[in-house]
UniProtKB/Swiss-Prot annotation:
Biological process according to GO: formation of cytoplasmic translation initiation complex; translational initiation
Keywords per UniProt: Cytoplasm, Initiation factor, Protein biosynthesis
Name recorded for this polypeptide: Eukaryotic translation initiation factor 3 subunit E
Assembly: Component of the eukaryotic translation initiation factor 3 (eIF-3) complex.
Domain PCI: 221-401
Keyword Cytoplasm belongs to the record: yes
Pfam families per UniProt: eIF3_N, PCI
Stored PROSITE patterns: PCI
Annotated Gene Ontology cellular component terms: eukaryotic 43S preinitiation complex; eukaryotic 48S preinitiation complex; eukaryotic translation initiation factor 3 complex; eukaryotic translation initiation factor 3 complex, eIF3e; nucleus
Lineage: Eukaryota, Metazoa, Ecdysozoa, Nematoda, Chromadorea
Species per Swiss-Prot/TrEMBL record: Caenorhabditis elegans
Length: 432
C-alpha cells in the first residue's frame, strides 16, 4: 500500500515537527521497510532540538558522542536564552499588558502596545527579538506550550511588515496543532489565511505556494474540528484561488477534498458535481482509489468497478493519518452514493435485485431503503411496495444551469493555464 501513501508527497509542504506524527502513524502499519523508516524518523528528529526523542530511537544501544555533545549544547543554549527572556515575559504577563493583548483587535493595536511597553516598562526592541529567538528555540525542543504562549506575545508586538511575522503565524499554528488545541488552531489558521490572502508577496507564484502550504496544514485542523470537513469544501473547492493551487502544486489534496465531500451531510449534493469535474480534469496528474471511486460512479457509470474501488478505499483510508478516523463515515456515504446512482441510472429497480446486491433479505432491504430515503432525503426516490420496486424521479437540467457549468469549467481551465505559464516563467528564472 505504499503506492497510495502520500507522506512523501506532503512532506515538502510541512514543517519537520508536523511530519514526525505522520511517520509515527505509518511506522507500525508495515507500509515501508521498518529499518529504513526508523532511520528516516531518527534523521528528522536529529534536525530538531528534541534530543531526548533522538536518544530514544537507539533503544538502549550506544549513543553517538555527537548526540551527547549536542544535548549539552542545547541545554546550555536553553539556559542562556531563558535568562534573557525571563525579564521580558515578566513584563508581558503584567495584568494590564495581558489585557491589552487579549483585547487587541485593531490593525494598529500592535504599535500601541509596543509604545505603551516602551514608555511605561522600559521595554526595548531587542527584547522583541529575544522573545522570537526563545519561541523558536522552545518550538525546536518540542516544548509547544511555551512556544505557543511566547509566539502569541510576539504576534501582538510586531506589525505585519516584520520579517518574522509570517514565521510566527506558522509557528503558532503548528504549536496548537501539535498540542491538539483545535479551537486555538482554527483561530490561528484563519489568521494565517487572512494574511496570505492579503497577498504581501513579491510574485504570484509565491502566493500560490503559500496557499498550498496552508491547505496542507489545514488538514490537521479540519479533520479534527467539528464541521471541519465542510470548511475543507469551502476552502479547497469553492475558493478558486485555492483550487488553482491544488491543480498546479498539490493535486494529491484531491483525496482529502473528495473524502470531505463524500462524507459531508450538508454540502455533498451541491459539491459532488464540481468535485467530479475537477477529478476528471486532473486524472492525468493524480488519481487514487478515492478519486477513482467517484470516476467509476459518475463518469464511467461502472458500478462493479466502483464497488472494487470502494474496497480499496477502505485500505487507503485506514492507512492515512488524516482519514483513518472517518473511514466509517466514508463507507456509509459511499454505499449510499452507489445505491442512489444505481437507482437513478435504472430509474426503476426491483427491491429483490437490490436485496441480492446488498446481501439482505427482501424485507431487510426494503427497511434499509426506507431508512435511507427518510434519513438522507434522496431526491425523487419512492418505494412502490405493491410492485416491490424503487422508482427514481428524473431531474431536468435547465439551459441556464448548463451554460453556468460550462462557463465555470472554462474559467477554471483559463486560470490553471495562467498559473502553469507563471510556473514555467519562474523555472526559467531559476535556471538562468
Amino acid at each position: 500500500m505504499s503506492t497510495f501513501d502520500l507522506t512523501q508527497r506532503m512532506a515538502p509542504f510541512l514543517d519537520l515537527h508536523l511530519i514526525i506524527p505522520l511517520l509515527e502513524f505509518i511506522e507500525p502499519r508495515g507500509i515501508y521497510d521498518e529499518k529504513s523508516l526508523t532511520e528516516m524518523h531518527r534523521q528528522l528528529l536529529t534536525k530538531t532540538n528534541m534530543i531526548d526523542s533522538v536518544i530514544e530511537t537507539y533503544n538502549g544501544k550506544p549513543i553517538p558522542a555527537a548526540i551527547e555533545a549536542k544535548k549539552k549544547q542545547i541545554i546550555k543554549e536553553r539556559d542562556e536564552l531563558k535568562s534573557k527572556v525571563d525579564s521580558v515575559v515578566a513584563i508581558l504577563e503584567i495584568p494590564e499588558v495581558k489585557e491589552m493583548m487579549d483585547n487587541n483587535r485593531e490593525r494598529d493595536g500592535n504599535v500601541r502596545i509596543l509604545e505603551h511597553l516602551t514608555q511605561n516598562h522600559n521595554f526595548t526592541v531587542d527584547m522583541v527579538d529575544t522573545l522570537f529567538k526563545y519561541s523558536k528555540f522552545m518550538y525546536e525542543c518540542g516544548n509547544y506550550t511555551v512556544a505557543s504562549v511566547c509566539l502569541y506575545y510576539y504576534r501582538n508586538l510586531v506589525n505585519q511588515a516584520d520579517p518574522n511575522y509570517l514565521n510566527a503565524l506558522y509557528g503558532k499554528l503548528a504549536s496548537e496543532i501539535l498540542l491538539q488545541e483545535w479551537e486555538h488552531a482554527r483561530d490561528d489558521l484563519l489568521k494565517l489565511r487572512a494574511y496570505i490572502d492579503a497577498n504581501p508577496f513579491d510574485t504570484e507564484w509565491e502566493l500560490v505556494t503559500q496557499r498550498a502550504w496552508l491547505m496542507h496544514w489545514a488538514l490537521f485542523v479540519y479533520y479534527n474540528y467539528p464541521k471541519g470537513r465542510d470548511e475543507i469544501i469551502e476552502m479547497f473547492l469553492n475558493q478558486q484561488p485555492y483550487l488553482n493551487a491544488i491543480q498546479v502544486l498539490a493535486p494529491h489534496l484531491l483525496r482529502y477534498l473528495a473524502v470531505a465531500v463524500v462524507t459531508s451531510k450538508s454540502r455533498q449534493k451541491n459539491s459532488l458535481k464540481d468535485l467530479v469535474k475537477v477529478i476528471d480534469i486532473e486524472r492525468h496528474s493524480y488519481k487514487d482509489p478515492v478519486t477513482d471511486f467517484l470516476t467509476c460512479l459518475y463518469i464511467k457509470y461502472d458500478f462493479d468497478e466502483a464497488q472494487e474501488m470502494l474496497q480499496k478505499c477502505e485500505e487507503v483510508l485506514s492507512n492515512d493519518f488524516f482519514l483513518t478516523a472517518v473511514l466509517g463515515d466514508f463507507r456509509e456515504s459511499a454505499r449510499l452514493l452507489i445505491f442512489e446512482m444505481f437507482c437513478r441510472i435504472h430509474q426503476c429497480i426491483t427491491i429483490e435485485m437490490l436485496a441480492r446486491r446488498l446481501n439482505m433479505s427482501q424485507e431487510e432491504a426494503e427497511r434499509w431503503i426506507v431508512d435511507l430515503i427518510r434519513t438522507y432525503r434522496i431526491e425523487g426516490a419512492k418505494i412502490d411496495s405493491k410492485l416491490g420496486q424503487v422508482v427514481m424521479g428524473v431531474k431536468s437540467v435547465s439551459i441556464h444551469e448548463q451554460v453556468m457549468e460550462n462557463t465555470k469549467r472554462l474559467t477554471l481551465r483559463a486560470q490553471q493555464i495562467a498559473l502553469q505559464l507563471e510556473k514555467g516563467r519562474q523555472d526559467k528564472v531559476k535556471a538562468t
